[in-house]
From Swiss-Prot:
The gene is allR. InterPro entries: GAF-like_dom_sf, HTH_MetabolicPath_Reg, Tscrpt_reg_IclR_C, Tscrpt_reg_IclR_N, WH-like_DNA-bd_sf, WH_DNA-bd_sf. This is HTH-type transcriptional repressor AllR. Glyoxylate binds at residues 154-156, 207, 217, 234-236. One of its GO terms (molecular function) is DNA binding. Residues 21-83 form the HTH iclR-type domain. Negative regulator of allantoin and glyoxylate utilization operons. Binds to the gcl promoter and to the allS-allA intergenic region. Residues 43-62 bind DNA. Keywords: DNA-binding, Repressor, Transcription, Transcription regulation. The keyword Transcription regulation applies. NCBIfam families: PRK10163.1. GO terms for biological process: negative regulation of DNA-templated transcription.
Amino acid sequence: MTEVRRRGRPGQAEPVAQKGAQALERGIAILQYLEKSGGSSSVSDISLNLDLPLSTTFRLLKVLQAADFVYQDSQLGWWHIGLGVFNVGAAYIHNRDVLSVAGPFMRRLMLLSGETVNVAIRNGNEAVLIGQLECKSMVRMCAPLGSRLPLHASGAGKALLYPLAEEELMSIILQTGLQQFTPTTLVDMPTLLKDLEQARELGYTVDKEEHVVGLNCIASAIYDDVGSVVAAISISGPSSRLTEDRFVSQGELVRDTARDISTALGLKAHL
């Protein structure tokens, strides 16, 4: 195991981390107070109500201002909730919109395929599971909501990759590398790129036990009203049931479901 050496005196790291956590908690408390105060307040009121020193309150507000989470009225000097908070909230609402629209289609897909249905989004260089509808089979393959999946080695991950422009795709792969999870994980660039090209042509991608041994997945990209990929929908099941002879029929079913969701989100033409 590689030893990580830190500069400074022994025992210094923990107090620094504690101070950082305390500053974060106080920053969140300020945002929550502004929200309860109708979106704005004076620095003195914030300081008084949160029992913080005035200098500390002002310093935290300046940090939040640098992140666009708050801004100061130049005339009155009051502090207001900024655009950064709106952007964070908008991302949450957008994801919830995808799920609320996808819900009926997920149920239909689950009933037609007989497999568990998942919805995932891309978060940086990972896919994150945000929605799931378990199948009714006694044997089913499920992962907890919030699970993180490798982009190159999961059905949902590859569905989030194949619509991307080659430059962005290569950038992601170079950053993440091609870690091997199972004997069938695609760990060389030419093979992965060929797999993604085929997925682009078919409108769906297949994960043949590439992330978990015994688990197969079929996934397709979901697009918003401007044609940007916003999520992926997949079915997952044991490889003994979701067998290779079902890949085409189930792949077309997943692809058509993704297209229906994309249309419901406002996409005018199929990509």
